[in-house]
Amino acid sequence: MMLEQDTGLSLAIAQIVQRLKGSSLHSQLERQARGSWEKRILKSLNSMCTELSIPLARKRPIGEQKELLNKWNEMGTDEPDLSLFRPVYAPKDFLEVLMNLRNPNYENGDQPSFRNHLGLIQVPLKVKDIPELKDSFSELGLNTGQLGIDDSTQVPPELFENEHVRVGQTVLTEQDSAAAQQYVRQGCPTALRAELWALILNISNQPEDILYYEQLKSNVIQHDLLVDSLIYKDVKLTASNDDYYFVFEDYLYQVLLCFSRDTSVLEHFSYNSATPPKSYIRGKLGMEEYAVFYPPNGVIPFHGFSMYVAPLCFLYHEPSKLYQIFREMYVRFFFRLHSISSHPSGIVSLCLLFETLLQTHLPQLFYHLREIGAQPLRISFKWMVRAFSGYLATDQLLLLWDRILGYNSLEILAVLAAAVFAFRAVNLMEVTSLAAAEAVLADLSTLKVMPLLQIFLFATVT
């Protein structure tokens, strides 16, 4: 069984788009870039399949099924030989693709103002400026109470927190999802976060949900997929080496292996610009009646993918509920961080927003780093593509993700990335190489998210 892209269809689309040149510039760009990128991912997966002589999928022998079932809750103790497996791609590979995005219509002069953009992203998408961001994130203002701010001048922190907890309990009692979303814009009390997030995401963990999770688990037990080894490898390379998350290794395997089998995830491709990859029964290449999506959820994991799940393990200890929360977070938010699109929360827009904020409000720093070959996006991209998971301390990361849920937007990731550069600007102005700049920004674990965001948006920038 081999993966194959439907090149005939892609070519037809490209030809149609060319004839409509000018009518949908961003769509044209997205389709061409996506087609090329998806083809590259499939080629990487196919090459691994061929080199290792491993099928994309196989049914496990009964003995192997029993063994996996017995060790389901302690898969972290398993040490399979993964030395020959490699991630299909890493964030830096994806950044190279985004850097090469071009729109010839704009390069011919349609939008001369964009020529002043000296960053790595050369796609003229509309992104918000500071006044618009202030308006969008008004609840982060200096005069608004926030969890994660220790020295509010308006209300003593303990008084705000006590009242905030009381309001949060009322929101939970009323089971009002919209009220919960508004509430978490000021941060979630630790004791209420799990329930509030579940309310916002409409996760109730009913018996049928638990049964569905068990069915996915059964599918994992019965069938072995090539992507299972990619998941194992990713967990071993990332979460297993993280001081915060290594204890959740078993949870990560369970959730991610089940996720790969979940065909309901395919539904998000109706609003995700990407195309789920297909495999064909051997000898039936290109015959649609013999095609299936591979993996079944249509999502090929990349290096760092498991870090989307890891922070959630602090909040949810019931595997089926943890699974549902992650799946909903993925189809609402995380897929946008590794998909090429012009959506305001898509990774291309986030990169452009980050670069625009730095170039506009910290021009000296931006130009200095650019001149020494340390384009800021080369450093910040990995933070944004993982939603800062694995970079911030967990308590700070959860405060950040509160706001992602509250504002139903990932734009705050770009704002925080710019705020980090602003915070370390003095040290960064002294560096003379990319390696030195990376060293200055190597450890974000001591940073306090909310003060950084407030200062950047509402205090130092006008």
Task: Give the positions of each predicted feature.
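Hydrophobic/aromatic-rich, well-ordered segments within soluble, folded domains that form packed cores
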Residues: 194-199, 297, 301, 382-383, ...
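Eukaryotic extended interaction platforms
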Residues: 1-176, 283-287, 308
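Alpha-helical repeat/alpha-solenoid scaffolds of the HEAT/ARM/MIF4G superfamily
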Residues: 142, 155-352, 362
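Alpha-helical recognition domains of nuclear gene-regulatory proteins
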Residues: 16-19, 71, 97, 117, ...
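Contiguous, well-ordered alpha-helical segments that form the cores/surfaces of helical PPI scaffolds
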Residues: 254-257, 290, 306-314, 324-328, ...
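Extended, Lys/Glu/Leu-rich amphipathic alpha-helical scaffolds
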Residues: 130, 139-160, 166, 171-174, ...
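Short amphipathic alpha-helical segments embedded in low-complexity Lys/Glu-rich regions
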Residues: 32-33, 62, 85, 115, ...
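Alpha-helical interaction elements in eukaryotic regulators
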Residues: 5, 9-12, 21, 25, ...
